[in-house]
Amino acid sequence: MAAATATAGTAACSSSSSSRGGSTDAAATSGVQPPPPPPATAPPEPLRKPRMDPRRRQAALSFLTNISLDGRPPLQDHEWGGGEEGGGTKPGARARLSLLAAGCNAFSAPGTAAAPWTAGSGSSPCPLPPSLVPRVLGEPSQPPRSAPAVTGAQLQLPDGPGGAGQEELEEDDAFTNVQVPSASFLGSGTPGSTSGSRGRLNSFTQGILPIAFSRQNSQNYCALEQSGQGGSTSALEQLQRSRRRLISQRSSLETLEDIEENAPLRRCRTLSGSPRPKNFKKIHFIKNMRQHDTKNGRDLKLDGGRQSAGAMSLKEIIGLEGVELGADGKTVSYTQFLLPTNAFGNRRNTIDSTASFSQFRSLSHRSLSMGRAGSTQGSLDAGSDLGDFMDYDPNLLDDPQWPCGKHKRVLTFPSYMTTVIDYVKPSDLKKDMNETFKEKFPHIKLTLSKIRSLKREMRKLAQEDCGFEEPTVAMAFVYFEKLALRGKLNKQNRKLCAGACVLLAAKVGSDLRKHEVKHLIDKLEEKFRLNRRELIAFEFPVLVALEFALHLPEHEVMPHYRRLIQSS
């Protein structure tokens, strides 16, 4: 009994964990409780770091594998030589596996703790299957077989026609089923953890290299596997140098490629896990900057199937003659419509300030028009026609002498002169008035009777339907008559111009709210039988044709305002 007790005490001193069961059995057999081992001699148990959830680790590895460091999408199997069959090797997977072997060799360097790697099995650190070496070196590989466990995960290299589905999954991402120990991710200060993270970054960089670089890099890393068993520091330095050299070569080749192809940008989705588009092509970013206004301020995709009024194409209706909008990628400058800032600061605050400013504006516009007429753009195509040189007269189109024509009889008396018109059929009088107007203004494409009829419709819509005041209607008349006298109106766009003038006058002359603007657009669409999109798109061409002069002087608005007050 004493011998058994002495034997149990000796076993407790020699081993703290493995022989404890034997001493307990001996003590139980003898019936004597052995003394507890001294706490000073027992070695402390190694601290267990919190184990990462395998699902979170798998998700993190999958995310890090699918992203790329230079913005390119992850490469698929068919782009890395998908035509090879059977024992053919994939350069992308081959390079990734060689990098995995290099990272594992760095972990197995002398002086590093290999206990976390060999805890689950008695194999060497980071074991690789025998089929890895022939696959890396480009030799025919053998049928798939399972490899020793790496912390509970298996690295399988399926090859051949038998494992088609698994081969597609494995070769698409060589790191999907490889789980690195949690010590390398949770901040262990050993050199093995640093080398493992660096090897993983090298694998990500290698995965996006061209095919030629992948083959060359795999050979270099295989040579490092054979010669890097002595020390991990030299192997890591060589890995870093090789990676920097390959990145610089890749960037230089991409620069040359971009120069040769007029610097196109690769526009594709870079979402994590999203497949690369099959019809992948390079699109220049300037060609992709066309927004909605593609053809003369309109979107033909939205309105291509709709037939417009007057059996005219949409391209002919939208846009005013002589108005450049910068369609089809052209750049148009409107700086000639601007006035100098000091024109507003040098005016005196007197009663005739409005008249002096209006005279200055008319003189500036006259000199501007004459300057444009003397330039190389003084042609009808550029908009410098007869109407651009005329000063606007608010009484011109409302002159009561227009309907007289050849049917009038002038009576001269000593103190006054009067005109008498005999009875004439209204149709003949209208025809005579339009002919006289056409002779005097040949550049205006609409007749005088049609212009006056449109003005009556504008007034009825603005005052009766929308409740606008007379100054707003007078401003709309000025805008519309300026377009008519400059020859911008025709039979196809006359209602669009009238609606755009009413809309601009309502925005400038009235404080409209959102629902009021919507109500006005609805009324214009109903009364003038217009399309809402065409009306809104026509607003900017009218603004350009008016030379952005929406704030009108008093002498242009007051005559129309007086006539509206008298007739109401």
From Swiss-Prot:
Disordered: annotated span: 1-94, 130-169
Disulphide bonds in the chain: none
Biased amino acid composition, Low complexity: 1-31
Composition-biased stretches (Basic and acidic residues): 46-56
This protein's UniProt keywords: Cell cycle, Cell division, Cell projection, Cyclin, Cytoplasm, Nucleus, Phosphoprotein
The protein's assembly and partners: Found in a complex with p53/TP53. Found in a number of complexes with CDK2, CDK3, CDK5, ABL1, TDRD7, CDK17, CCNA1, CCNE1 and TP73. Interacts with CDK2, CDK3, CDK5, ABL1 and TDRD7.
Alphabetical list of InterPro entries matching this protein: CABLES1/2 (IPR012388), Cyclin-like_sf (IPR036915), Cyclin_N (IPR006671)
A GO term from the CC aspect: growth cone
SUPFAM superfamilies, per the entry: Cyclin-like
Cellular localization per UniProt: Nucleus; Cytoplasm; Cell projection, Growth cone
Protein name: CDK5 and ABL1 enzyme substrate 1
